[in-house]
Regions:
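Membrane-interface alpha-helices
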Residues: 3, 24-50
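Membrane-interfacial loop-to-transmembrane-helix junctions in polytopic alpha-helical membrane proteins
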Residues: 3-13, 35-38, 118
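Jelly-roll (double-stranded beta-helix
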Residues: 54-89, 93-104, 116-119, 123-125, ...
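A cytosolic small-molecule/anion-sensing beta-strand core signal
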Residues: 132-133
């Protein structure tokens, strides 16, 4: 009698189910008598928490899909310059999203020696740097790029980057965001938390819901977590944070 074989697509589906539905996977692993024995015991011990994480991830993203989109609006502010006390620089808004009808935002940054920000990337806008005075170091995918007076560099969408000042003198530079994507609300919210004692000394919000909102407003993501996990997760958690009312904590800084 000819032995029947399982098609490759069906094998793939069964493998996915084994990871997502723990009881199904447990049954298949022990029924098939996988060798060596440590494979079965490894799945038995680690499969449950892994399966629960996948189900929680799916549950969060599905729940958030029914929630309203983020409110990226900001009030009319008279203060054009704000200070980042943790990272040692100030930002002056030259052109806001309201003033350009969402086409771009432009700021002037004055960065002290030793100041800078963390590795991150954006999925919704391009970030253009133009140095006015001094020397700026822009990290691009792990490699430092020195930008001197009168010169430019660009961080494209999806490019991991950061800026910092390794020189002994302050550096001043323009940053242009195209298109404008709640950049002003992101900056005002983040700096507001720092200056009101609601962030750690290295600038991270003490309340994780605040962090999810700040990242969500500008579609920005940090290093260390793969994009296919981080991007839908931040999108979902930022909407849940708004649903829980944590966005109201930013009103003193943005309204």
């Amino acid at each position: 009698m000819k032995k029947t074989t399982t098609s490759k697509p069906l094998q793939f589906i069964l493998a996915v189910l084994a990871f997502i539905v723990y009881p199904f996977g447990l049954y298949k692993v022990w029924k098939k008598d996988f060798r060596p024995l440590w494979i079965r015991w490894t799945y038995t011990i680690l499969g449950l928490p892994f399966s629960l994480l996948i189900l929680a991830f799916a549950g969060l993203t599905i729940f958030a899909s029914f929630l309203p989109e983020l409110d990226r609006s900001i009030g009319v502010r008279s203060d054009r310059t704000i200070v980042n006390s943790a990272d040692r620089y100030s930002v002056t808004f030259l052109k806001t999203s309201r003033e350009t009808n969402g086409a771009y935002e432009e700021v002037k940054v004055d960065l002290e020696p030793g100041g800078g920000n963390l590795w991150h990337y954006h999925t919704a806008f391009v970030e253009k740097f133009h140095v006015i005075d001094g020397e700026l170091t822009v990290g691009m995918e792990g490699k430092p790029v020195k930008v001197t007076t009168g010169n430019d560099t660009i961080a494209q969408k999806g490019l991991m980057h950061k800026f910092y000042n390794t020189s002994a003198k302050p550096v001043s530079f323009f940053v242009r965001i195209e298109p404008a994507r709640s950049f002003e609300k992101t900056i005002r919210s983040g700096y507001g938390l720092m200056n009101s004692g609601q962030s750690t000394p290295d600038g991270m919000p003490k309340n994780p819901w605040h962090l999810f909102l700040i990242l969500g407003y500008s579609d920005s993501y940090l290093e260390g977590v793969p994009g296919f996990i981080q991007e839908p997760l931040i999108h979902a958690l930022s909407k849940i944070a708004q649903w829980k009312g944590f966005d109201k904590d930013f009103d003193p800084f943005c309204r």
